[in-house]
Amino acid sequence: MTMVNIINGPNLGRLGRREPDVYGSTTHEQLSALIERAAVEFGIKAVVRQSDSESQLLDWIHLAADAGEPVILNAGGLTHTSVALRDACAELSAPFIEVHISNVHAREEFRRHSYLSPLATGVITGLGVQGYLLALRYLAEIAGN
């Protein structure tokens, strides 16, 4: 059974409280439950993780790379700043989907650059928390589930 790693970066643990006009009212706990229910429906396993620590995100990406497992990554603000995160993602051999809840291209200029997008299999931005479910469905379909 396919295992998908959903990795959320800085400030995403504050979903539902931080800028709900931008990120919506769904909390991280609710998002995790949505993803876990969808994974069961799609016939795959999913583990949802969140950390404000770049070091922890790197560790999780390295584990996924070593296991050959797909990743759905919302690196938050590290998307625009972290070469280390980019280098870790370069080690991923399985599909990697970059997800952003808000449309980063309709926001501040500094949010429009991603160190991760050139490496990603695909990028989903601006579709709210549904972006995670779309990414999960895609990964399930290409895995044959």
UniProtKB/Swiss-Prot annotation:
Q: Name one GO molecular function term.
A: 3-dehydroquinate dehydratase activity
Keywords recorded for this protein, A-Z:
Amino-acid biosynthesis, Aromatic amino acid biosynthesis, Lyase
Q: Where is the active site?
A: Y23, H100
- Transmembrane helix listed as a keyword: no
What PROSITE patterns does the record point to?
DEHYDROQUINASE_II (PS01029)
The lineage's top-level taxon is Bacteria
Q: In which pathway does it act?
A: Metabolic intermediate biosynthesis; chorismate biosynthesis; chorismate from D-erythrose 4-phosphate and phosphoenolpyruvate: step 3/7
Which Gene Ontology BP annotations are present?
A: amino acid biosynthetic process; aromatic amino acid family biosynthetic process; chorismate biosynthetic process; quinate catabolic process
Annotated catalysed reactions: 3-dehydroquinate = 3-dehydroshikimate + H2O
Q: Which Pfam families does the UniProt entry name for this protein?
A: DHquinase_II
Instruction: Report residues binding substrate.
Output: N74, H80, D87, I101, S102, R111
Site location (Transition state stabilizer): R18
> Under which EC number(s) is this enzyme classified?
4.2.1.10
Keyword Amino-acid biosynthesis among UniProt keywords: yes
Provide the function of this protein.
Answer: Catalyzes a trans-dehydration via an enolate intermediate.
Q: How does it assemble?
A: Homododecamer.
Q: Which family does it belong to?
A: Belongs to the type-II 3-dehydroquinase family.
Entry protein name: 3-dehydroquinate dehydratase
Q: Which organism is it from?
A: Mycobacterium leprae (strain TN)
User: What is the taxonomic lineage of the source species?
Assistant: Bacteria, Bacillati, Actinomycetota, Actinomycetes, Mycobacteriales
